[in-house]
Amino acid sequence: MSESRKLGEQERLLNYLHGFGGLIAMSVLHIRGRLDPSLLQQGLDWLQEQHPILRSHITYGGLVFRSVPPFVYRQPSFVIEGTGRIPLRVVNDPDPEAWRQVLATDLRTPIKRGKLPRLRVTLVRQSANSDLHHVVVCADHATLDAQSGNMLSRHLMEFLADPAAARARQPIHASLPPPLEDGLPRKPDSGKRPYQPAIRLPNRPLPRPKMETRVIARRLEADDADRLRSAIKTNRTTLHGAVTSAFLLAVRRRYGLDEMTVLTTIDLRRLMKPALHPETYGCYIDILRTKNPIGGDLWGTAKDVSFRLISTLARDQQSASILKLFDWEVYRKELGGIVSHRRRIDGLAVTTAGESGLRRDYGPFELADVTMAVSLDMFGPSLFIIGSEREGGIDLSVGYSASAISEEEVTALADDAFTQLGGRTG
């Protein structure tokens, strides 16, 4: 660990994509209570003390040459010295839905280069006397994954509830933790898995296309979520398998497809040697593509999804990973589909972030809801589903680009999947 280090291979790729508006990571905390902007800024300052990545900026050094696009780039590095505070902007707008426009704008606006952290925050409220506040967090995906996003939200809420207790907490890391590649064993590759091209959702009429990432949110409350967890245990599968299966079956009913590729985010902290502390802040993921037949019922499909993902991770992680620069084979097989399908790189992506640790009550504040999203305008899957557990319930955020698929299509797919999982759409 040190006061500076080069970005790892995946951090470098994600930072590069961020500069073009790709995979910008967002979350929104919907908070009830009289939240003073100065207290929120104190919380952001404290987060920087706790997490070295948050008190670092990125510099760009010598040239690196490659045989595939981009053929040349400057080597990026995290540097702690000289980094400024996390910027906080306050928006007062009488429109109760103004936070959605802030979210949409941030999702297509990369964080500028310079000596600021790779995170920015906007506090959206109707007025200075409002009881409901929306804390919109925008991050460079090179510095944050879903687990880190939940941790940031949890730590910030804990500070707001009791600043003195939070300040007494010792940081997990005193300086920058290592990149993924430094501690990860070589990715398994049997050599028997050819490149798997994406299977995309069919194009449907799009009467009002708009370059804007949007989110449809659904929540399974605790009683419905408990029934789902019991069924998952009985059927020997996972929450990821169940959520993916529900959306696959919804796709089959709506489009008549009998197979589909799925992008799945995998947390790799525990696979590193030595294993990273579970509260290490940063981006420690891979994204794997698997091809899944769509047949049978919810639970049969869920078990098949889980089996294919586990076997791919164990045997063919290297070839199944999409978190790497495209080579010429990928360009040959994917460029036409990306162009003809409104810049979609796949049909579905599913991330299940596990238990967030977030609760409703935080001293004088109440966490009313949480929204999570990833920018999909420049490119991405048709649907990006993020599942996270909170206070016994399960939150589902279904992201999509309004330039690629209509709200009516996404709502129909989300409601179908949600109903299969035991949710109540009425």
What are these model-derived regions, one by one?
Residues 1-67, 72, 96-119, 252-426:
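Acyl-thioester-dependent acyl-group transfer interface
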Residues 156, 160-164, 251, 309, ...:
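Short, well-ordered alpha-helical segments in soluble proteins
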